[in-house]
Curated annotation (Swiss-Prot):
HAMAP family: OMPdecase_type1_B. Homodimer. Catalyzes the decarboxylation of orotidine 5'-monophosphate (OMP) to uridine 5'-monophosphate (UMP). Substrate binds at residues 22, 44, 71-80, 131, 192, 201, 221-222. It comes from the Bacteria. Keywords: Decarboxylase, Lyase, Pyrimidine biosynthesis. GO terms for cellular component: cytosol. It catalyses: orotidine 5'-phosphate + H(+) = UMP + CO2. InterPro entries: Aldolase_TIM, OMPdecase, OMPdecase_AS, OMPdecase_bac, OMPdeCOase_dom, RibuloseP-bd_barrel. The lineage of its organism: Bacteria, Pseudomonadati, Pseudomonadota, Gammaproteobacteria, Enterobacterales. This is Orotidine 5'-phosphate decarboxylase.
Length: 247
């Protein structure tokens, strides 16, 4: 079912780093992408860039050899989300996500929609609690538990719905591995090399801290995309992870 013209997914990427692209210009995005090696990372395309540039942009990244995490956080009725996830799979992305708060029926429908894709199906993960949210934010939504407790509730729901993993804060990673098992993938934004600006992420960790906590894939944006030498920054982060030295 997947578009036969798309470059096959890169099955040899061992890096846990996913670079978050955040550009208003496609030319600027591709200029950055052409400075890094697809063996060193995967790429995340979110709502803004997908809305601006569409599926063709994802295909362009894939043609350059990159695996793509399509970060659109689908949240709708089960049938709509199932069709959206299938469309993402047909595009050939490496990973796609939904909101766990959409419930178990929605997540199960999304998982079922990927069955026809077999081994070519993307990883299907769910968003638990956004890393920009704290207890005050949750209280405003009528949720009286801590972000960690809410993330655990939603992670268990995701696991029971048959999905591959969750997006979560690195602070919840160790506990979620205990609750959901080592095979359950944890994808974590809010990762900043030591000394980086924290931006709008409140619950952050360094790459080495995230690795030690059990994170499988760490999403890093501006510390790499705004670096004067992004390829070297990527190499430095990977070296720190391999050597167990904080970057």
């Amino acid at each position: 079912m997947k578009n036969e013209n798309l470059q096959q997914k890169n099955q040899t990427v061992s890096s846990p780093i996913v670079v978050a692209l955040d550009y208003a210009s496609q030319d600027a995005a591709l200029s950055f992408v052409d400075r890094i090696d697809p063996q060193d990372c995967r790429l995340k395309v979110g709502k803004e860039m997908f809305t601006l540039f569409g599926p063709q942009f994802v295909q362009t990244l894939q043609q350059r050899g990159f695996d793509v995490f399509l970060d659109l956080k689908f949240h709708d009725i089960p049938n709509t989300v199932a069709h959206a996830v299938a469309a993402a799979a047909d595009l050939g992305v490496w990973m796609v996500n939904v909101h766990a708060s959409g419930g178990s029926r929605m997540m199960a429908a999304a998982k079922d929609a990927l069955v026809p894709f077999g081994k070519d199906a993307p990883l299907l993960i769910a968003v638990t609690v956004l890393t920009s949210m704290d207890e005050e934010d949750l209280r405003g939504l009528g949720i009286t538990v801590s972000p960690a407790e809410q993330a655990e509730r939603l992670a268990v729901l995701t696991h029971n719905s048959g999905l591959d993993g969750v997006v979560c804060s690195a602070h919840e990673a160790q506990r979620l591995k205990q609750v959901c098992g080592q095979a359950f993938k944890l994808i974590t934004p809010g990762i900043r090399p030591a000394g980086s600006d924290v931006g709008d992420q409140r619950r952050i960790m360094t790459p080495i801290q995230a690795q030690q906590a059990g994170v499988d894939y760490m999403v890093i944006g501006r510390p790499i995309t705004q670096s004067s030498d992004p390829a070297q920054t990527l190499c430095d982060i990977r070296a720190s992870l391999l050597n167990g030295i904080a970057s």
